[in-house]
């Protein structure tokens, strides 16, 4: 046994585990189109766990968005979702919607949001894998970072709040609006509705805390 002192890390609260899981799911939905296994799991999935207290308006909207996403999964086929994902976020020549959230942030000659993001990730010891083709500001990567912050509990709640407000919330809402405006967004219209509602829940929670 190592001589290093053992450290007890308490488990995540049910609320934080639900947050981390939902960030992970949203990251998966936007990183690549859902395959047959994920669609099957979502068809059987229950709504995100809620507290015993009555739901807020934001919580009710999130639950409704979840129900709509599950319903969309019932009639979805992987091949069609692959086509939709490709057309919306990859494109042949140019995607209909950019999934890189720094594109929805103000940029000045003095500051590049992506460079600032990379600097923040480097402070936490995070870096893009060499084989990764997507930049760090891809919506999926930012959601994965939020999940890492919640599950790792190394940076604390204030770091979650700062990262969320600095890189995720406002540009995420603009991304959701851009996807919703696309006529070709069928399944992903429901995915961005879930994301939008979840971001609103997170924003209110951070504002209260």
Whereabouts are the PLM-identified features?
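Surface/interface-facing alpha-helical segments and adjacent flexible terminal/loop regions used
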Residues: 1-209
């Amino acid at each position: 046994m190592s001589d290093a002192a053992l450290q007890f890390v308490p488990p995540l609260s049910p609320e934080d585990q639900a947050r981390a899981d939902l960030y992970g799911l949203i990251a998966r939905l936007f990183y690549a189109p859902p395959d047959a296994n994920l669609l099957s799991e979502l068809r059987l999935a229950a709504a995100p766990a809620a507290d015993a207290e009555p739901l807020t308006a934001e919580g009710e909207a999130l639950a409704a968005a979840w129900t709509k996403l599950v319903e969309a999964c019932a009639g979805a086929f992987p091949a069609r979702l692959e086509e939709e994902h490709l057309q919306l976020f990859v494109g042949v020549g140019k995607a209909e919607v950019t999934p890189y959230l720094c594109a929805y942030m103000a940029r000045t000659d003095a500051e590049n949001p992506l460079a600032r993001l990379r600097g923040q990730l480097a402070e936490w010891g995070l870096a893009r894998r060499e084989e990764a083709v997507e930049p760090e500001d891809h919506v999926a990567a930012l959601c994965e970072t939020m999940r890492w912050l919640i599950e790792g509990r190394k940076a604390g709640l204030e770091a979650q709040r700062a990262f969320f407000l600095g890189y995720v919330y406002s540009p995420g809402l603009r991304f959701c609006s851009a996807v919703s405006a696309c006529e070709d967004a069928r399944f992903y219209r429901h995915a961005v509705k879930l994301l939008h509602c979840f971001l609103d829940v997170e924003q209110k929670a951070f504002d209260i805390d």
